Amino acid sequence: SAGPASLLSWILAGAILGVLALVHAELGSTYPLSGGTARFPFLGFGALGGFTGGWMAWIQAVTIAPIEVEAALTYLESTSLHPGFVHSNGTLTGSGIAVAGVCMAVFTYINIMGVRWLAESNNIAMIWKLAVPTLTIIVLLIVTFNGSNFSANSGGGFAPFGAKGIFAALPLGVVFALEGFEQAIQVGGESKNPQHDIHRAVIISMLIGTAIYLLLEVAFIGALNPKDIGHGWTNPIPGQGSFGPYASLATTAGVGWLATILYIDAVISPAGTGLVYAGTSSRLSYSLSRNGYWPPRLGQVDKRGVPFASLIFCWVIGMLVFLPFPSWAGMVGLVTAATVLMYAMAPPSLAALRRSDPDRPRPYRLPAAWFLAPLSFVCANFIVYWAGWNTIFWLYIFIIAGFVVFFVYQAVAPAGRKLALHWKAASWIPPWLIGLGIISYLGQFPTSKPSSGWPFGIALLAKQDIPFWVDLGVVAVFSLVIYYWAARVAMPTEYVKQAVEVVDEEANLAALTQEHEAAPVA
């Protein structure tokens, strides 16, 4: 959607996620708690704020494994084997869904076997995932590089779709590729030296990821045949190249051995990511249960310390994700928006906790937080807005479903698990989500129907009542109002100090949350 200007999309995404990563780095090193992305809003905004952050984190975690499985099957379909797992429109066939279920079951089984199996499997996959992209960059830059592709006038120039194309590319795959820095936060409570390790892991992972993907994009654009982009950038690789673009380019360049490695990588890399997130989603289910948000059965572990019920539950939900969102492209937009909403909870949490817990040692402090924290919140809302009304609508269906389950459970939960919700501290959350949805509905994204992969064939277009560029100003002003609102209604100091101890020890949160009410911080 951006042409050669996609390089700017990668730089912009790296900068935005980089600042968000720095926000998480301070929070993670200051509050090294397992499942940190769900815990920070709990500390800053009470039980309802904690559920909101935890639910968004769970949505993105439980959908990533299915996305990675479908990506692997889609790549496999583009090989000479043609196993019949994917329809021509990108959706899975019946046999494809069956194979996807087996893959998800394997991820679940490895996680059930415990941390040692998971760590060994993930270490191997991680080495592979770094080596193959690096090799691809080097080979393509040496073997085939057409510098004219970066300014091909016949294809519309450097930015054939203008600024709108650059922005729209972020939620279509760019941000999705760079996500994942929060994994160091999720396991922060298990690090040997969290105050020293967490912020370094977050920052280094973002720098390496951004550099690799930016160079991959340079190699990709440079390897394209100038004749194929003469008609435009809509389909720069004719035929089935869109299913395995780098492998197709390697084949065309005469390096078939690299294409073979890339097809193997198309299975190993998604499998490694899916394996990690199968465990992450179960960890978050466990955390939501331990926090009193979900039934206690999901918060139980077996003799190996594995949350067996949560793993099975997440496998079932992962399979359901294939049904309404069968297309890889359709799922990427959804999970990107969910992930960025999860990230967006961090800047207000940082502001709230700096005000209500100012004396706590902070091994890493975000520089110029007065500027970077609100800026990161604005930029996170930009990415969600660029995902488009179609994506936001379906994401909000998931969010509403989660709140319905939460409130129903709270209504029937035994007295010992009922939570004081701290409505005042979380008062900014409903206006934030509703307002962002309204702006998206009236805004500029999307302006054309996606080709496939949306639930039940429904594609919802934005009304475009707010002009382009004006819409970004509206999002920015709205975001700043919400940010400073959130900072003013933080939970009081006494609550935060006790909550850190209770969360760290996984004690009875219901007892804690009944004791405090939100109070504005002077």
Predicted segments with their positions:
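Loop-to-transmembrane helix boundary motifs in multi-pass membrane proteins
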Residues: 47, 62, 94-101, 192-196, ...
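Membrane-helix boundary/coupling elements in multi-pass transport proteins
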Residues: 33, 56-71, 178, 183-191, ...
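Membrane-interface loop-to-helix entry segments
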Residues: 95-149, 202-206, 335-344, 395-402
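TM-loop-TM module centered on a large, flexible mid-protein loop between adjacent transmembrane helices
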Residues: 39-41, 46, 77-87, 201-275, ...
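Hydrophobic alpha-helical segments and their helix-loop junctions in multi-pass secondary transporters
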Residues: 79, 111, 127-157, 217-226, ...
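Extracellular loop-to-transmembrane helix junctions
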Residues: 1-91, 95, 99, 208, ...
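Terminal cytosolic tails of multi-pass membrane transporters
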Residues: 350-372, 393-522
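Hydrophobic, membrane-embedded alpha-helices of multi-pass small-molecule transporters
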Residues: 1, 100-106, 140-143, 157-223, ...
